[in-house]
């Protein structure tokens, strides 16, 4: 499966002359892990949102195997994991309810991500950032997922948790031949986990 961005342009209201993303081109193939680095505020998160279909570009488009990403309904093969997991889960739902919305989660993923069963009966605020991020990863890694967009997903976590998560993701990506976009300020991380690195400047 191939995720492509062609002539991708995006600007916020009344900022047409200063687009945050300007005629950007990108291709990610199955099994490829692309690193993306660049200064804060440059538009890396916005790019991820465009690639996942959460935002509509002002010009250009995003295609998945030649089909516009926004045409996908239901479980999209492109999934995104965010830097701040607490912002993308409903604080009023227990984790088992949030997980149920994503469909069946493989027990193998729960085990590999060290997700404790008792966490399922807790609310998001009762978990640490690392624990909650593990849930978000399990939810994003449904069987249909072919491309995973990782936006600074371990930047706020301790070093041990970072290492555990990336070890798991590398193993999972290789096992499934899953494509990945890895956004990070850490060049050391990108060099370790990615097959190629691009600079967003």
Predicted regions and their residues:
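A short, flexible loop at the N-terminus of ABC-type nucleotide-binding domains that lies
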Residues: 1-5, 9-23
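The feature captures the beta-strand-to-loop junction immediately N-terminal to the Walker
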Residues: 37-39
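Helix-to-loop junction immediately C-terminal to a conserved catalytic motif
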Residues: 52
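ABC ATPase NBD coupling module
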Residues: 67-79, 93
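Q-loop/switch helix immediately C-terminal to the Walker
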Residues: 84, 91-106
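Conserved ABC ATPase signature
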Residues: 123-127, 131
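Hydrophobic anchor residue at the start of the ABC signature
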Residues: 137
């Amino acid at each position: 499966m191939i995720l492509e961005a062609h002539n991708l342009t995006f600007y916020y209201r009344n900022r047409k002359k200063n687009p945050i993303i300007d005629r950007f081109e990108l291709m990610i193939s199955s099994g490829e892990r692309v690193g993306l680095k660049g200064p804060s505020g440059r538009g890396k998160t916005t790019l991820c949102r465009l690639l996942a279909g959460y935002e509509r570009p002002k010009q250009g488009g995003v295609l998945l195997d030649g089909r516009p990403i926004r045409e996908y309904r239901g479980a999209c093969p492109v999934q995104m994991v965010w830097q701040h997991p607490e912002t993308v889960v409903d604080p009023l739902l227990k984790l088992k309810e949030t997980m149920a919305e994503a469909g069946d989660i493989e027990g193998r993923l729960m085990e590999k991500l060290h997700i404790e069963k008792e966490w399922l009966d807790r609310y998001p605020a009762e978990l640490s950032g690392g624990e909650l991020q593990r849930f978000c990863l399990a939810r994003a890694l449904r069987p249909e997922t072919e491309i995973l967009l990782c936006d600074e997903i371990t930047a706020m976590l301790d070093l041990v948790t970072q290492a555990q998560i990336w070890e798991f993701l590398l193993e999972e990506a290789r096992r499934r031949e899953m494509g990945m976009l890895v956004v990070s300020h850490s060049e050391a991380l990108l060099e370790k986990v990615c097959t190629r690195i691009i600079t967003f400047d």
